């Protein structure tokens, strides 16, 4: 469910050594399955453990996950990274905003999942996002760009060289991708 690297476990173990005995960590998602989902880590003293929590035992620590957050933390990873600028804890949870779908799910759900979990996090760095509007009978994925992508001079490149290539590679049944957006250049546009 969640991978916690050795470096992160050591970091947590050090922090937990200053807490009440038996205290571990809790990993959670606020607003799971929505575009506003946020992940977090907190201390979890023994009296805060619920009967419905899942305990994940690692070499140096245990992590508790509540039953509502659990499906959205599939494939999550917590790491503690040190570089020239210092150290930071990173938590990557690709399924926090949308529950992972099975390979047998309808094509529209699988495409939507890929857009939300893989493509939109990349576009978010530029203040943009893309939404799947429909998949046509002739197997075209119709997309609409928003935020910083609307009116961006790089949107055609992003669509053809990024999104379309990835979607066609993952879903060979698709024949192409089209942009439905009426692009209007403005201050919101990234380029």
From Swiss-Prot:
- Record GO biological process: iron-sulfur cluster assembly; protein maturation
Protein residues bound to [4Fe-4S] cluster: 149, 152
Which cofactors are named for this entry?
[4Fe-4S] cluster
The protein's superkingdom reads: Bacteria
| InterPro entries (alphabetical) | Fe/S_biogenesis_protein_NfuA, FeS_biogenesis, FSCA_dom_sf, HesB-like_dom_sf, NIF_FeS_clus_asmbl_NifU_C
GO molecular-function annotation terms?
Answer: 4 iron, 4 sulfur cluster binding; iron ion binding
Cofactor binding comment, as recorded: Binds 1 [4Fe-4S] cluster per subunit. The cluster is presumably bound at the interface of two monomers.
UniProtKB keywords: 4Fe-4S, Iron, Iron-sulfur, Metal-binding
How does this polypeptide assemble, per the annotation?
Homodimer.
Report the family membership.
Answer: Belongs to the NfuA family.
Q: What does this protein do?
A: Involved in iron-sulfur cluster biogenesis. Binds a 4Fe-4S cluster, can transfer this cluster to apoproteins, and thereby intervenes in the maturation of Fe/S proteins. Could also act as a scaffold/chaperone for damaged Fe/S proteins.
Question: Which HAMAP family has this protein been placed in?
Answer: Fe_S_biogen_NfuA (MF_01637)
Q: What is this protein called?
A: Fe/S biogenesis protein NfuA
């Amino acid at each position: 469910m969640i991978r916690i690297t050795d470096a992160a476990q050591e970091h947590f173990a050090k922090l937990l050594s200053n807490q009440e005995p038996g205290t571990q960590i809790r990993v959670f998602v606020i607003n799971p399955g929505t575009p506003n989902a946020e992940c977090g880590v907190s201390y979890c003293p023994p009296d805060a453990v619920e009967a419905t929590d899942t305990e994940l035992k690692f070499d140096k620590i245990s992590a508790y996950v509540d039953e509502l957050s659990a499906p959205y933390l599939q494939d999550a990873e917590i790491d503690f990274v040190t570089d020239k600028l210092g150290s930071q804890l990173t938590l990557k949870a690709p399924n926090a905003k949308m529950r992972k779908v099975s390979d047998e799910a309808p094509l529209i759900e699988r495409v939507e999942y890929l857009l939300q979990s893989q493509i939109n996090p990349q576009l978010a760095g530029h203040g943009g996002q893309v939404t799947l509007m429909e998949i046509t009978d002739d197997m075209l994925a119709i997309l609409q760009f928003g935020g910083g992508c609307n009116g961006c001079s790089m949107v055609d490149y992003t669509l053809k060289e990024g999104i379309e290539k990835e979607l066609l590679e993952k879903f060979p049944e698709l024949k192409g991708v089209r942009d439905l957006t009426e692009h209007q250049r403005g201050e919101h546009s990234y380029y």
